[in-house]
Amino acid sequence: MDVPAFRERLLRLAPKDPLVLAVSGGGDSVALALLVKEAGRQAVVAHLDHGLRPESPLDQAFVRALAERLGFPFFTERVEVARIAQARGENLEAVAREVRYAFLHRVAREVGARAILTAHTLDDQAETVLLQLLQGTARATGIREREGIVVRPLLAHTREELRAYLRARGEAWREDPTNQDPALDRNFLRLFVFPLLEERFPAAKRALARFAEARAEEEGVLERQAEARLLPDPRFFVPAFRAAPLLEAPLAVRRRALRRLLEKLGLRPEARLVLLLEEALRGRPQTLPGGVLARRKGGTLFLLPPRPRLPLPPGFRRPAPGDYLERPSGRKRLVDFLAEKGVPRELKPLWPVRAEGSRVVEVLGLYPPPPEEAHMAEALAEAASAFREGEVPVGAVLVLPGRVLRAHNRVEGLRDPTAHAEMLLLREAGPEARGGRLYVTLEPCLMCHHALAQAGVEVVYGAENLKEGALTRFGLPTRARGGVRERECAKLLRDFFARLREGCRSG
């Protein structure tokens, strides 16, 4: 082991003391503690007894003695992991990992540590990559060198290198007998698969580690693109995302975005579950583990828990048979109104309403129309003007303190390819545009997206722009919100292009 090189790597990964060292008593973590001491860093030793083995008190005593010898403060807890896993009906290894990291983060908060060090090695990296490939998680990026405040400074070193380091110093370590149990997938790979691989391919572990490193770099780029495609639809009280940015994404980006969705739900990002979400995006509802229903309605992908819980503010109740709204256009049944607003059927019986008898006077978040609906109605009126003038029917309003500006596309009328509704409003507002909010019937194109971002204008749009949308077509990150009066915005565009096609046929 090259201690100076380790010192430099540790300084790069975790420049500030104190450090929290996760030490089980095994050879890897004992080597980590000794290396940190040799590097001259300040640290505390954290040891969690999982309550899984009769000899675990001996492990704790060994680690305590090691910490005292090194002059590091010692923190320990005992948690009955098997009991927790059984009560939850969850995988023992997954629960053990969750409990262990929760303990390490508590210790870090208590001592004010900026980094938690674990002793994962190149062997762990190779095993993890192969396990991920075999389990169908698809990413196969292995273990990250840094993840939040968790740092893994030994990923470049093999288990044998660390054992040689310990033997050269006459240091002892504890052996965990459960590491010899082939019933566990990781142990099976370590005990049987890798020995066979290394007979034929001696550099197999390093090759897998290099593969993981390259994949992690690629994944970082694709992850940022995938995250941009996850555009929440905040109108609903359950996880909901705009469907078009996902559907229009390149396959690799879409599947990464869907894996992120699975992780947000607390599910493993397995390939089969990603395929289920793709089916849901195409309009075929799918049930995920845990009873979560993935269903697309209109332009929104819903992830409905088995028992959705919607808030019931004081004075509100659940919908009842016969409920209706009295609107200027006439009476409308509540169930029809909720369907018009894109509320999935699973949420209709739960949506909070305030009523006088059967006459509904308020539908939470939907009626009376929120201000954004009124502003989008103004944008729709502008789009209708564009329609009548033979322009692509896109309208927009820019809401500023004390005034509202309105515009619609005038590309043909002005013979100016930049005369989009958004650009006309920015020109009119000038420096006052900063901090304003733009309501536009169609998702902005690349030109308008960049101009609005530079001007510091928040964007709310109606329909997705499948052909030129900055997010939907090109995947640019955005803080815009979409889907407001989506049906009306999309219908106006459909009607315009249908008339255009009819005119071409007539001509």
UniProtKB/Swiss-Prot annotation:
In terms of CDD domains, this protein maps to: nucleoside_deaminase (cd01285), TilS_N (cd01992)
Disulfide bridges in this chain: none
Protein origin, superkingdom: Bacteria
What family does the database annotate? Answer: Belongs to the tRNA(Ile)-lysidine synthase family.
Does the entry feature the keyword Acyltransferase, yes or no?
no
Q: What is this protein called?
A: tRNA(Ile)-lysidine synthase
Quickly give the catalysed reaction: cytidine(34) in tRNA(Ile2) + L-lysine + ATP = lysidine(34) in tRNA(Ile2) + AMP + diphosphate + H(+)
